[in-house]
Amino acid sequence: MTFESHCINSSLTIKDALIALNNLRNATLTLFVLNDNAQIIGTLTDGDIRRALVNGHGLDCTLDKVMHRDYKFIRQKEFTVANLRSFRDRRIIFIPILDGENHVVDVVNLQKFKSK
């Protein structure tokens, strides 16, 4: 499964995000929310959706209203083992790798690597 399956446009709805998360099957249940220029502007998890629904948002609410804007990432040129360890130490396991224009170029899933 490629990282593109984790990308979704901010103009889509909570219902669209639920369908996308359901289609991920056994993958990490995190979506990267992109603007119309394919730049990441937030993340969305099943927990974010649950909180949005509990707070009164409907299935037709757009993702830009409920996404998590303070997401963590690594810049492509700063991709190092030390940075990965820092994320693991903070229990962040699914990390988007961004280019200089905030496009997702790859994703690291630390669940797939053994701890040392």
Over which residues does each language-model region extend?
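Generic structural signal for individual residues within well-ordered alpha-helical segments
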Residues: K15-L18, R50, M67, K114
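Bateman (tandem CBS) regulatory domains
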Residues: M1-H6, L18, C61-Y71
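The conserved cystathionine-beta-synthase
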Residues: C7-T28, L34, L53, F73-I92, ...
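Short beta->alpha transition motifs characteristic of CBS
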Residues: F32, Q39-V54, I92, P96, ...
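Phosphate-interaction motifs
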Residues: T28-L29, I40-T45, N55-L63, Q76-K77
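N-terminal/domain-start segments enriched in small and hydrophobic, helix-friendly residues
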Residues: M1-C7, T45-R50
